[in-house]
């Protein structure tokens, strides 16, 4: 049924996008500047600075960064492995910041420096179409500069830049092998389609029929990526890739709105609109994010969320982001100017923090989140996920979780590993099959995650772990995840229940029915805390002057364990100050085991979970 509904949704989205692409009224094409900006926006951004300390902070950050570019040499075509992406991203940041600085200050030094940057990029032999993200971002960079500086640029420079956008940007998408993003369901679709639409809208007058056809193709392709937000707004590639993919999706739709007065149906996709809430709940009390999959843990204001707040007329969507700016967490990312653009239309004095303490996402990467509050670094945060390892950018982490309490993240996720480092070492990184070398990377495989392992075996990469129940009462909050498909071949049933009591003590309960062979089961978490086994069933963690106890309960043979440091390969990032702690269970063939591990700052605390009808949990 779920597969049928997603297929039906895809048909609807494709039909909608196709209809919109055929009815775009190019007679309404706005004059330059037409990308993102409408009449009055520049004045509104200046007024935003006058009434908002946060806006003034962001504006000053952009201007000071642009000042630094004035004396810098233009970027060069320097590859990093198989990518030019770092150069494309730097170019986008420079041109966007310099163009913003010119429009808001009228200082021609910024426009002249942006012109110099663009002309240097036009001299590149190509923008590396074999890795099309590089082309997508570079095309957007020059499109913004061409459009925002249109009245400043000499005709000769416009011609050079417009020709480069057409030849090295738009026409690169004609190569079907290189432009596979048209068929992609992930961030590549969003980033590359956005870049192509920017290039086409900016230079529409130069090749109108070509540009219209390319925009139509992009709008027919983009709904494939829109499916990823179903059904609740979560992003299957994690926090970092939401910021990337959705940031460019916002850029795409906002450009259509400003240039043509339409959103092409994108802004009516409800799960897409809900996705800003997902990012809010990925923010933890420590000021970090829940960094599952290929994501870092760093956290700052997310500029693209301000488009959602504007679109939904709900400033509270960015309440957490406004708080982050006050904490000094202003992002240095290349899309920062859209904070000023979208934020200027909001009354940010009317924001309020979220009221709900829990949030759940079903779909490709199911997640349950609990947060005890929103105003203190000592608030409790817990998040647990399902999913499968064969998803894009996924790790082998079904059943894994993070846990913050007393201002400490006790159970951590190591997040992403540098791609270039692995690729240069010859690692087959993007192969997600069962026997892929990808799973041997410590940060990506199961050994580093806060989940189970049976007999040291890999998880079943195609086994989808679903959230099958959630509960949210003052005395009991949590979720139940069916991990049976994850451990197919080693167990006939694995159900993980995560529950927090009224004092935010966490219990992870695992119901295991062993397969037809004996199993050694490792229950493990990764932590930065000091660890000590203080009793046969108890491990004490200490960090930043705080203490947490892990206490095991169950009628099975088990021992507490602190694992030795991992033996990293030469090309892996070494995770210093990391410990893996937990319990090792010995199960007989076909044995049923119910075990609990309680994580509490009270040594004697132990929770017994209510009896659950586990037979109802199978999918």
Predicted features along the sequence, with ranges:
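Aromatic-lined, polymer-binding surfaces characteristic
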Residues: 26, 33-50, 54-288, 295-296
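Carbohydrate-active enzyme catalytic cores, enriched for enzymes
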Residues: 203, 244-410, 471-476, 480-482, ...
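Primarily extracytoplasmic ectodomains and periplasmic/lumenal surface modules that are beta-strand-rich
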Residues: 42-43, 53, 377, 408-410, ...
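Beta-sandwich/jelly-roll carbohydrate-recognition scaffolds of carbohydrate-active enzymes
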Residues: 54-57, 63-66, 71-77, 356-358, ...
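Histidine-centered active-site/metal-ligand motif
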Residues: 134, 188, 241, 392-398, ...
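Bacterial Sec-dependent N-terminal signal peptides
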Residues: 1-23
